[in-house]
Structure formats: structure tokens, C-alpha cells
Amino acid sequence: MKPINIQDQFLNQIRKENTYVTVFLLNGFQLRGQVKGFDNFTVLLESEGKQQLIYKHAISTFAPQKNVQLELE
């Protein structure tokens, strides 16, 4: 049985559904936008037509505007 990767499932779901999300960084700064892509180290966030590439090690929390349905089986 393959281990569940909740992080990838969560990010992929908010990406596919174009869910608006608030990203809290470790320094307390907040970014708002939509996740357009991600890999093992970064998240691409788009807000008001501008893109920001954020390193995951700088992120504390993702807070989506609506609940995300994950398949944990």
C-alpha cells in the first residue's frame, strides 16, 4: 500500500479547484491568491495577475477559503 501524501493532495486539490488561499509565512507575512503549481520545494501563488514563487520552508500555514475534500484511503 502506497503511503498517503496529504500535502500533495491538499495542494493539488486547491490548485484544481482554483480555491483562494491565505498563505502564512514564518515571518508572519500573509499572502493571498491561488495556487497555480507546486513541487517538492516551492509553491507558485498567483494574485491579481502577478505570480510569486514561495519556498515551502518559509511557509507556516495554508488557510483555504473553503474546506478541502481529501481522499485519505
From Swiss-Prot:
One molecular function GO term is: RNA binding
GO terms of biological process kind: regulation of DNA-templated transcription; regulation of RNA stability; regulation of translation, ncRNA-mediated
- Which GO cellular component terms are attached? cytosol
User: InterPro entries from the entry?
Assistant: Hfq, LSM_dom_sf, Sm
Name all Sm domain ranges.
8-68
Q: Does the keyword Protein biosynthesis apply?
A: no
Write out the entry's keywords from A to Z: RNA-binding, Stress response
Subunit annotation: Homohexamer.
PANTHER family (UniProt xref): RNA-BINDING PROTEIN HFQ
Which NCBIfam families has this protein been placed in? Answer: Hfq, PRK00395.1
Q: Could you say which protein family the record assigns here?
A: Belongs to the Hfq family.
The function of this protein is:
RNA chaperone that binds small regulatory RNA (sRNAs) and mRNAs to facilitate mRNA translational regulation in response to envelope stress, environmental stress and changes in metabolite concentrations. Also binds with high specificity to tRNAs.
Identify this protein by name: RNA-binding protein Hfq
